[in-house]
């Protein structure tokens, strides 16, 4: 093989810098904007604002196309609210319909396809064909493969959690990392969107402002404690992204890539994965795993991110440990035992009882409840024991009186029949 052909093979493994390629400005294409509009309507067509947008969608899309072409587009002001899920509080900015259309264009046509080649396979969040089930399955494969290689469960697994992940993404580092990989026609829009995420820190002293980038930021605490009259627009902190924004989801997938590359390439970790801010490393010794975690901590520090010391820990593979809300144990015979966390079942039982009240006052229908319960049980049943499933089905029948029909010869169909026999 000639040196020239080898050079072609080597260079073809890495994407060409995209801002050097002549490309069509897809941001202003009406067909692309229309597809983005349809995508934005999914799941929200019943809301008032999307319906108003739909009534004049041609003129709205034409105006957006003109603003994007002239580079006069600005993100609209939106409502801010606190969303509570699984005991966590998240600060969400409800994006306007026109802004959601622009986000779909930028992410679906530029960010997602252009950044995907730089991601590792075991980066499982917010990507087509991947998701939380994908991440869990890959974690289980890594556990099985460890046993197949070593024929024992004497190894260790380390877990790393990035604290206030979205709150502490620095805009300058995002621009430095992302913009060279996308065309300039999209880079200006990326910079414009980041402006809406800037945090008004006019209340800070000069010393606090000088150190704010190196200090962990908490958007919930900021929203609850800093009064509106203190946010005068005098100075802004170029840090934090909105967790509810589609651009933020793409950034959450891509931004910690240096951490992934450090673990997979520099340290050569065979069994490593990341789901947004949740990371795992499997190794033969505790010292090996600790060394990788220390290196990850340094990489996170370079990115301006913070390690959650309370949630970062190392466990024996033979012990019971939790990843992505599932409890795992690797036995000495190579079997992976997985169980749903009990608090998840308790939470769903409370939800069913709350749904009963909502049905009684007319805010939900029995069909809505069945759809919610069917979705939850269908997703979680592979992590539940037969007794747990039967008890959940019994509670559903006690509260709503109906019986859900499952796929014939499926596990849920069999257990539903067993539940009917015992109750009968």
Where are the regions a protein language model picked out?
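Non-catalytic, polymerase-adjacent accessory regions of viral genome-replication enzymes
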Residues: 1-62, 413, 418-424
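Right-hand nucleic-acid polymerase module
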Residues: 2-10, 95, 100, 104, ...
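Active-site-proximal segment of RNA-dependent polymerases
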Residues: 21-23, 109-170
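Short, conserved non-catalytic motifs in the polymerase core
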Residues: 45-51, 76-101, 118-131, 201-253
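Amphipathic alpha-helical blocks
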Residues: 53-77
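Conserved polymerase palm-domain catalytic core
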Residues: 142, 149-276, 280-295, 315, ...
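A common structural junction motif
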Residues: 182, 297-305
């Amino acid at each position: 093989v000639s040196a020239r052909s080898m050079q072609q093979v080597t260079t073809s493994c890495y994407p060409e810098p995209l801002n050097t390629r002549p490309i069509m400005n897809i941001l202003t294409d009406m067909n692309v904007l229309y597809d983005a509009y349809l995508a934005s309507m999914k799941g929200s067509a019943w809301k008032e604002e999307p319906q108003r947008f739909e009534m004049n969608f041609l003129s709205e899309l034409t105006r957006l196309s003109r603003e994007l072409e002239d580079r006069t587009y600005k993100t609209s002001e939106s409502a801010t609210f606190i969303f509570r899920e699984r005991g966590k509080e998240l600060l969400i900015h409800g994006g306007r319909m026109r802004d959601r259309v622009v986000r779909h264009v930028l992410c679906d046509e530029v960010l997602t396809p252009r950044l995907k080649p730089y991601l590792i396979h075991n980066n499982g969040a917010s990507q087509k064909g991947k998701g939380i089930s994908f991440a869990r399955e890959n974690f289980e494969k890594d556990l099985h493969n460890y046993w197949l290689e070593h024929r024992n469960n004497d190894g260790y697994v380390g877990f790393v959690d990035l604290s206030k992940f979205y709150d502490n993404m620095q805009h300058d580092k995002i621009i430095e990392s992302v913009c060279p990989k996308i065309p300039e026609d999209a880079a200006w829009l990326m910079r414009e969107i980041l402006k809406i995420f800037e945090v008004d820190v006019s209340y800070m002293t000069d010393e606090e402002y000088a150190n704010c980038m190196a200090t962990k930021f908490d958007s919930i605490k900021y929203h609850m404690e800093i009064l509106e009259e203190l946010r005068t627009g005098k100075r802004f902190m170029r840090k934090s992204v909105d967790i509810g924004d589609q651009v933020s989801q793409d950034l959450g997938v891509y931004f910690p890539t240096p951490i992934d590359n450090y673990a997979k390439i520099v340290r050569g970790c065979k069994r490593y994965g990341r789901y947004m801010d949740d990371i795992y490393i499997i190794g033969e010794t505790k010292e090996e795993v600790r060394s990788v975690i220390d290196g990850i901590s340094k990489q996170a520090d370079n990115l301006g991110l913070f390690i959650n010391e309370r949630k970062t820990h190392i466990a024996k593979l033979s012990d019971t440990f939790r990843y992505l809300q599932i409890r795992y144990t690797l036995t000495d015979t190579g079997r992976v035992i997985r169980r749903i966390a009990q608090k998840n079942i308790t939470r769903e039982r409370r939800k069913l009882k709350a749904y009963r009240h909502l049905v009684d006052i007319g805010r939900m229908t029995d069909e809505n409840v069945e759809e919610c319960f069917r979705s939850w049980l269908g997703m979680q049943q592979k992590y539940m024991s037969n007794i747990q499933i039967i008890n959940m089905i019994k509670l559903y029948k006690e509260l709503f009186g109906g019986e859900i029909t499952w796929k014939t010869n499926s596990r849920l169909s069999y257990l539903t029949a067993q539940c009917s026999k015992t109750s009968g």
